[in-house]
């Protein structure tokens, strides 16, 4: 964990998430094995500290982290947060990660069906999954975290139940059993095929409709041409909308672009320019 924490601090500014994960691991050991461990937490903290201190961007690496923490905590700094720091509507929480919800349900059902006890690994993955779900409920930027830990939890459950699952499959796949229940198997497989085909068709139609409703690719052509004609080469265009940057950049390599920065970072770097942008937009 020491070298991992060091590399994590260099590669990802949200690397401090390693600390609560190691705490959850220690809690899992305490609950399942009745022993208290502290070394993983200490090594993770030491690795992260070294990574932030022995860093080509030091001390900006620490300032960058400090400016991000208010967004995570939800306290704010008076600057309107970026869209990624808003939470999804309740139904969107399911729509965006419905596969993860189904996978979580499958993991819980497998545990219940086979009456599995919680091992250290399974409990850790479950606690980490719960933590990531809370972060996901907090802000949409954590949408990529939670499904990954759901997959880890479900994989851990399947691993624990692998012996029982294999026995069940062998029993169901026995030729005598298949012959006895051939009508049930035929109905099940036919129904599964129909459901999969219908779901694929609905998804294809929905995707086509969404693509047709996208903004036209040439929506910023006139603005790009105007900037080329009326601004010096390599002059900076201040644009905080990351989703409009590809369209602008595609039509204009004449200018330099400031795009996609979190509003807090933009404000700290150049407060007057950010306030001007806010007033103009």
Where are these regions (language model features)?
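Hydrophobic/aromatic-rich transmembrane helices and adjacent perimembrane loops
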Residues: 17, 135-174
């Amino acid at each position: 964990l020491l070298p991992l924490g060091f590399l994590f601090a260099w590669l990802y500014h949200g690397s401090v998430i390693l600390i609560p994960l190691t705490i959850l691991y220690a809690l899992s050991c305490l609950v399942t094995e009745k022993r208290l461990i502290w070394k993983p937490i200490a090594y993770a903290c030491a690795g992260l500290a070294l990574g932030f201190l022995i860093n080509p961007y030091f001390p900006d690496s620490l300032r960058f982290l400090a400016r991000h923490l208010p967004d995570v905590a939800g306290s704010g700094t008076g600057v309107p947060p970026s869209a990624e720091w808003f939470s999804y509507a309740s139904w969107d929480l399911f729509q965006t990660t419905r596969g993860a919800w189904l996978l979580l349900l499958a993991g819980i059902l497998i545990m219940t069906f086979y009456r599995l006890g919680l091992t250290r690994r399974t409990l850790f993955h479950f606690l980490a999954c719960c933590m990531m779900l809370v972060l996901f409920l907090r802000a949409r930027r954590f949408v990529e975290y939670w499904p990954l830990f759901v997959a880890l939890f479900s994989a851990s459950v399947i691993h624990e139940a692998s012996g029982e699952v294999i026995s069940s499959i062998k029993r169901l796949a026995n030729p005598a059993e298949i012959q006895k229940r051939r009508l049930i198997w035929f109905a099940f497989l036919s129904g599964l095929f129909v459901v999969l085909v219908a779901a694929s068709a609905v998804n294809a139609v929905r995707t086509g409709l969404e693509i047709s409703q996208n903004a036209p690719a040439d929506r910023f052509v006139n603005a790009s041409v105007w900037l080329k004609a009326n601004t010096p080469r390599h002059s900076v265009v201040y644009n905080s909308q990351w989703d409009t940057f590809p369209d602008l950049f595609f039509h204009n390599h004449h200018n330099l672009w400031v795009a996609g920065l979190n509003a807090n970072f933009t404000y700290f770097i150049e407060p007057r320019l950010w306030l001007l942008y806010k007033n103009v937009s």
